[in-house]
Every structure is written in C-alpha cells, then in structure tokens.
From Swiss-Prot:
GO terms for cellular component: ribonucleoprotein complex; ribosome. NCBIfam families: rpmH_bact. The gene is rpmH. The keyword Ribosomal protein applies. The lineage of its organism: Bacteria, Pseudomonadati, Pseudomonadota, Alphaproteobacteria, Rickettsiales. This is Large ribosomal subunit protein bL34.
Length: 44
C-alpha cells in the first residue's frame, strides 16, 4: 500500500495557490486571515 502524499507541483499550485485562493470568497477570507496573523507566506 502506498502512502497518502503523492507530490505534484501542478496539483499543489492549482489547489492551494494564490490564484485559486483569490478566485473564491472563502479563499479571500483565508488570505485576509493569514495577512492579519502576519504570515510571511500566504499560500503555496
């Protein structure tokens, strides 16, 4: 049985990247919350 994490840079960027976050209302909320926390990295 293989592990659960099968790395793929394309899938990572598409699912968790900045543009996918900006494309939904909830995603923008995530970004704003991370900005408020003072995160250096906002998303993948």
């Amino acid at each position: 049985m293989k592990g659960t994490f099968q790395p793929s840079r394309i899938v990572r960027k598409r699912r968790h990247g900045f543009r996918s976050r900006m494309s939904t209302k909830m995603g923008r909320r995530i970004l704003n919350r991370r900005r408020a926390q003072g995160r250096r990295v906002l998303c993948a």
